[in-house]
Amino acid sequence: MLTAETIAVAMSGGVDSSAVAAMLRAEGRNVIGLTMQLWNQRRLAGHEGMPETVQGRCCSIDDVYDARRVADTLGIPYYVVNHEERFERDVVRPFVEEYLAGRTPIPCSLCNNHLKFDQLLIVARQVGADRIATGHYAQVVFDESLNRWLLKRPADKSKDQTYFLFGLTQEQLSRTLFPLGGMTKPEVRELARKHNLVIAEKPDSQEICFVPGGDYKRFLEAYLTEQGDERAETEIAGEMVTTDGKVIGEHAGVHNFTVGQRKGLGVATGSPLYVVQIKNDTRQVVVGKDEELYSRTLRAHRVNLISTAELREPMRVAVKIRHKHQPAPAIIESAGPDEVIVTFDEPQRAITPGQAAVFYDGDIVVGGGWIENSTQ
């Protein structure tokens, strides 16, 4: 008689991961619940205008409590693993440094790369699990003709999370399940109700888990104050200039801006202006007209390829430059080790350094990398 496979489910306390645990349990798998405690939500309470109390969101104490209640309902073992130190080192600090350097980071992708599909697999082995499962809306399949594991977009394209998963390796994909890949969100909620899970009606988290209210500027100031770092008020201040080099004002720090931003520029002109570029070396914020936001090419670095081992020749793909961006037709070609040049068929608006460029061949994720720069 075959022994049932043991799956460790990454439980955030939300509907999706809870539904995954219930689904696998109903299938007869041995299920173990794992929650990664990543950030103390009360750590910065009261600093630099941060709220004194913080409501629960992914990774909070309240969410750990919800995950534990779900595990109790399902009758599965449940463990909380503290990774706060590593989360701060690999996610929070890079998030802060990227903003201070004038880039716009994606902490969810950093967390996936360094924690959820790295440390979680290590912990899963330690508790005797064969594989891990998460509540991401994505699909993973093995292609025998390519002899590779493939990452694919989910059935419900409105919930597609593959943009944040481009960094997964073949080893990680081979040991990961995405049970919700063929389901819609309403179906997932109905599944949670069917299993009488207390979180069935819990709202989705819509913000960065460690940034209360999504106010990243306030978070940066509070974190820097706690760390005794004065850069937010000193060396990152600079000039605001037009695309032809005319100085039209000053700014309090490049971390206050992102490419494409219109509001909060602090300058009055006769026509709308947008942030076109942030120059880290001179601390200048360059502003211009909407048409000056469009670029045809970008360079991506730290590229991870999934559907192929290497990019031997130019390849036609569709590319997303932000999570909600409609994939745009383009050609990608190697520009050196772990670097790719992307040339779009049509210019794209507000290509933003620090974001990811993710390459698709239909529903298959070819790979992706971090946007370094763009040119018109």
Predicted features and spans:
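AMP-forming adenylation/ATP pyrophosphatase catalytic core
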Residues: 133-376
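ATP-dependent adenylation/nucleotidyltransferase module used to activate substrates
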Residues: 1-166, 177, 185-188
